[in-house]
């Protein structure tokens, strides 16, 4: 409820295997989900009461799908696979069901038959380019690529590639509303990077790198998610195992970041977070099975539990 912030469960689909990430179609009448431990993607109709009705499930062949999104025309569903190291473009039918795979784009590994493990598929604000972060994980290369999208065929063409340091492992990125400033977090390196993006050429230019944990932290930590607040003034990053959130103010003229603080997430292993339509920040803690609501102060950049 947006009135009192309370959550009410209305349905539980108990037969679904590890529905690890979901997205709406552009009408928000359909939902698509990847099944993280398998090679499956499912479609659902969203009914008037908010419950889901399963439409179909397809096997794309790529193992461990981790992210899913829909193109601007609502014609294709894009899926990133971690162990498969491949982006899959799937035809979206008018009834919301998933059709055939019409295009693929694979990140090669260090040896023949090996891949770089893709962890995200992020559109620019106009949905003309896709940014896909990949972790090296021994057999591949840690990287982020900019890919030009063919709206008719669903195919991708690389326009630029950023290679990270060995073991830093790029995980997720987020695009600023101005479509020029791109921010990416590196999982093992515990860093957040700032890039300038040129939508005319599809090129990325790395300009800044900051830590996502305080310098006093000596233990293990994994950066997991990066988001921009609704005002477009701040970048936020969640850190697993140190169980914290890092906040950075964005310079409105240059896009450079300045840290405003590190905040406890009040749970264990914050794997994902997002902002609601009410401006609240919701942090999902994987190992404590909790979602914690925070108020985000746009004046100070502070996260305050509600």
Predicted segments with their positions:
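Asp-box/WD-like beta-propeller blade repeats and closely related beta-sheet repeat scaffolds
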Residues: 53-124
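Short loop/turn segments immediately following the C-termini of beta-strands
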Residues: 36, 82-83, 92, 135-137, ...
